[in-house]
Amino acid sequence: MVKRNQRKKSAPKKRLTKAEVEKQRAIKRMILSVLMALLLIFAMLRLGVFGVTTYNMIRFLVGSLAYPFMFAWLIYLFCFKWLRQKDGMIAGVVIAFLGLLVEWHAFLFAMPRMLDQDIFLGTARLITRDLLALRVTEFVGGGMLGALLYKPIAFLFSNIGSYFIGFLFILLGLFLMTPWDIYDVSHFVKEAVDKLAVAYQENKEKRFIKREEHRLQAEKEALEKQAQEEEKRLAELTVDPETGEIVEDSQSQVSYDLAEDMTKEPEILAYDSHLKDDEASLFDQEDLAYAHEEIGAYDSLSALASSEDEMDMDEPVEVDFTPKTHLLYKLPTIDLFAPDKPKNQSKEKNLVRKNIKVLEDTFQSFGIDVKVERAEIGPSVTKYEIKPAVGVRVNRISNLADDLALALAAKDVRIEAPIPGKSLIGIEVPNSEIATVSFRELWEQSDANPENLLEVPLGKAVNGNARSFNLARMPHLLVAGSTGSGKSVAVNGIISSILMKARPDQVKFMMIDPKMVELSVYNDIPHLLIPVVTNPRKASKALQKVVDEMENRYELFSKIGVRNIAGYNTKVEEFNASSEQKQIPLTLIVVIVDELADLMMVASKEVEDAIIRLGQKARAAGIHMILATQRPSVDVISGLIKANVPSRMAFAVSSGTDSRTILDENGAEKLLGRGDMLFKPIDENHPVRLQGSFISDDDVERIVNFIKDQAEADYDDAFDPGEVSDNDPGFSGNGGAAEGDPLFEEAKALVLETQKASASMIQRRLSVGFNRATRLMDELEEAGVIGPAEGTKPRKVLQTN
């Protein structure tokens, strides 16, 4: 019995669980917090000797800031869990409080009675006097802690400089307490500067318009006064009562002036983008009609050629120099678009700090030593830039995309290994809330040059900067992505950007829209060469018309002696400056195909040939293409098309195969499908992730209606594809003829030479589609060259070579 009791006494105590230990700590923390709160309350209320003494002891530490110090301490005791979740809140309060201590102590030692006293001894003497007398009467500045901070600052910067240092501490503390970071502040400052610049430019334009109105009004009054004087002078002339003729000598002078005016060359009105619609009333009726009069065509180019090299022209090139629009044209303004809505990404900033810890822990669990250098919050994704340790292979990190997505609870993760131009690896994680980038916001923040008519703001990068591209440098663009990924919105944004900068006599469009709903809103704008083409059979002919225009322009360039459209237009300007006969510069042409796959199904051979020829030669002629498709497969985007359309824009696709078809690399399958894209221009080896701008249908209709009010559409018959029918020879599913295939003789010669007949051989040797090859086999059978099909056996060749 004794042994059993001894065994029980010597048994080890049961170890507490982690939850029980945490519970005991919480109880101790609560008891300590309550006791500390009671102590602070007694001190704040100065209850009795204990309260006054405690208050003076706190004053000894922080001086006359004892009340704010105790109040902040009480908040920390009961809200410390909430404060720990707010990163930077505690540090901000501490730094701001230190700044206040410096300010209070600088104020104390600016008093006359403290000027000659030692900082530490003078402060201690004031506090000790109240402490021993059990009273609170003296202003003691920032206490001993304030004296400790103030002494070196006052020694280095003087008493006045201490005020500035303390103020900087307070500003820094307030900045840390807010959810903003330095990038938000710089972005806010940049936006404020941009808005001030825009307001200044608008005021400058308004002042210019007012000056022009006053000038035009003065000219009008002067002309009216001159006309009245002339009418009065003519009324005073002597008229022969028999013949009714003027017998004064002024008759000859008047006749001479009229004759001189009739032979004078019309003056081309200079374009003024500030001219308002209501200013037309400032012109006389004759002047207004004269300003809207179209300039006559200058048929022969011999004068221009002789002014340069006096070269001979064997055959005159027919080029229409007649302007198709009136010269009084006002460009649209950004006010036509809906204003930008405010965005709040403070939630993302709190999430970023958490994700940085998760990323480092996840890599550590896989035995990879990395450090997150920085994080950039974009509109749709946040990019974490990590630096691997020496000896860590890049593919070890890139292979962890799925594991990182699991750890971060993200939809998908895209890894950019490495970031071009940096010794870092980028990890792009989708944001919890996508911030929409409006077209107006992107336009106002972009730094596009208004002189570059084809420079278009495309979207925002991950760092929040607006990115623009110049279609003239691309020189052609392929846009591909699945349905609903933002492809059509991006095309509308490109068109709207060009319409915002270019007049109809500067840029022309040819739009091809087999779906009949995407681009039909642009019908009847003056920038169109022909109405929007919706018939796929007409589209191939329309593209051929553009090819013919390209050839005509090159023939013109060769005879004038220039290499591109810029050189030709420069020659025209020089010729117009020295000659009374004016010529019109050539316009840029932008060809937009909204659904390339539909055209390739109807007339693949003709469409592909036209696209390839334009891709090879059209840049110097001022012709550029934008090809869009929602089926990025190799039978739509062939190798020749990709070789001649070097700039690519990939939206979200379903597989890595489609991404490789567009960009020649993976990545587009990781996109969100919310207007984000991978843009790979001609001058970059790696794609750039951008968040495209959103432009609503209402915005498009407003800008289209504004342009239609400026001028009417004047289509060019030279680009009209004419009428086509379903039985039109030359159109078939693969580009072959419906009857009497032109490759029949070649196919017959091939079969007779090889004494073999199969659709696959014809398809391979003649480079045709399978459907066309089977039709050629049927024609060979009807012509008696080969026998009928016998199941799996090869066909017999009935003729010999």
Curated annotation (Swiss-Prot):
Q: How does it sit in the membrane?
A: Multi-pass membrane protein
- Region Disordered, as annotated, extends over 720-739
Q: Which residues lie on this side of the membrane: Cytoplasmic?
A: 178-801
Q: What is its main location?
A: membrane
**InterPro entries listed in its UniProt record:** AAA+_ATPase, FtsK/SpoIIIE/SftA, FtsK_alpha, FtsK_dom, Ftsk_gamma, P-loop_NTPase, WH-like_DNA-bd_sf, WH_DNA-bd_sf
A GO CC term assigned to this protein in UniProt: plasma membrane
Q: Which UniProt keywords are given for this protein, alphabetically ordered?
A: ATP-binding, Cell cycle, Cell division, Cell membrane, Chromosome partition, DNA-binding, Membrane, Nucleotide-binding, Transmembrane, Transmembrane helix
* Domain FtsK, first and last residues per copy: 464-660
According to the lineage, what is the superkingdom? Bacteria
Cell cycle as a keyword of this entry, yes or no, is: yes
Database matches in PROSITE patterns: FTSK
Binding of ATP occurs at G484, S485, G486, K487, S488, V489
Cell cycle among the record's keywords? yes
Q: Where in the cell is it found?
A: Cell membrane
Q: What are the GO MF terms of this UniProt record? A: ATP binding; ATP hydrolysis activity; DNA binding
> PANTHER family, from UniProt?
DNA TRANSLOCASE FTSK (PTHR22683:SF41), SPORULATION PROTEIN RELATED (PTHR22683)
Q: What is known of its domains?
A: Consists of an N-terminal domain, which is sufficient for the localization to the septal ring and is required for cell division, followed by a linker domain, and a C-terminal domain, which forms the translocation motor involved in chromosome segregation. The C-terminal domain can be further subdivided into alpha, beta and gamma subdomains. The alpha and beta subdomains form the DNA pump, and the gamma subdomain is a regulatory subdomain.
Function description:
Essential cell division protein that coordinates cell division and chromosome segregation. The N-terminus is involved in assembly of the cell-division machinery. The C-terminus functions as a DNA motor that moves dsDNA in an ATP-dependent manner towards the difSL recombination site, which is located within the replication terminus region. Required for activation of the XerS recombinase, allowing activation of chromosome unlinking by recombination.
Q: Which family does it belong to?
A: Belongs to the FtsK/SpoIIIE/SftA family.
Give the record's subunit note: Homohexamer. Forms a ring that surrounds DNA.
Q: What is this protein called?
A: DNA translocase FtsK
Protein species of origin: Streptococcus pyogenes serotype M6 (strain ATCC BAA-946 / MGAS10394)
Lineage, broadest ranks: Bacteria, Bacillati, Bacillota, Bacilli, Lactobacillales
Q: What's the name of its gene?
A: ftsK
